[in-house]
A protein has these predicted regions:
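Thiol-based oxidoreductase modules, predominantly thioredoxin-like and allied folds used
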Residues: 66-83, 98-110
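Conserved helix-turn-beta segment immediately C-terminal to the redox Cys motif
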Residues: 35-36, 45, 49-73, 93-96
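Amphipathic alpha-helical repeat scaffolds
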Residues: 21, 41-45
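Short, internal strand/loop/helix patches
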Residues: 13-14, 86-135
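N-terminal "domain-start" segment that seeds a small globular fold
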Residues: 6-30, 115
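Thiol-/selenol-based redox modules, centered on thioredoxin-like
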Residues: 115-118, 123-171
Length: 171
């Protein structure tokens, strides 16, 4: 029993990480405690890129004290995000009016995978599931306590029932 408690106490949560904003500033995820967080890996030259519009709509509808979306640009799939952070920011703002937090471009798979994505995709780290990123716009659902509670495939629209019901507590 005591060994089990010490393992549980040492388990990392989403809040234990710090990301870097698209503008290069530290973004401690601990500031999101108490919110549901939808984490999405993004790309500007993908068939799923129009999901930015749905993500922004979801953010405008539900974002605030209880819910937030965080975008992580990446170039892991067929070079579909070749731009610099400033080019990505301009693209997202100009074409989709993105106001939800966007982070600096990272890697979501392979040897240079960002530690946040190592946690998101590895059951040994998140304690819930192995969930390798299969393509751009895969969605990870984080509860108010910083725990991974589910994923949504890349092709599934951000405003799907699974995500909306989770945000609104109808799940």
């Amino acid at each position: 029993m005591i060994a089990h408690l010490s393992i549980a106490q040492n388990k990392k949560t989403f809040y234990d990480f710090t990301a870097t904003t698209i503008d290069g500033k530290p973004y401690p995820l601990s500031q999101l405690k108490g919110k549901k967080v939808l984490v999405v890996n993004t790309a500007s030259k993908c068939g799923n890129t129009p999901q930015y519009a749905d993500l922004e709509d979801l953010y405008k509808t539900y974002g605030g004290d209880k819910f937030i979306i965080i975008g992580f640009p990446e170039n892991n799939f067929m070079n579909q995000e070749p731009g610099t952070n400033s080019e990505i920011k301009e693209f997202c703002t100009k074409n989709y009016g993105v106001t939800f937090p966007m982070m600096s471009k990272i890697s979501v798979k392979g040897k240079d995978m960002d530690p946040i994505y190592q946690w998101l995709t590895t059951k040994a780290e998140n304690g819930v599931m192995d969930a390798p990123v299969t393509w751009n716009f895969q969605k990870f659902m984080i509860d108010e306590n910083g725990n991974l509670v589910g994923t949504v495939p890349p092709k599934e629209k951000p405003k799907c029932d699974k995500i909306v019901n989770w945000i609104t507590g109808k799940q």
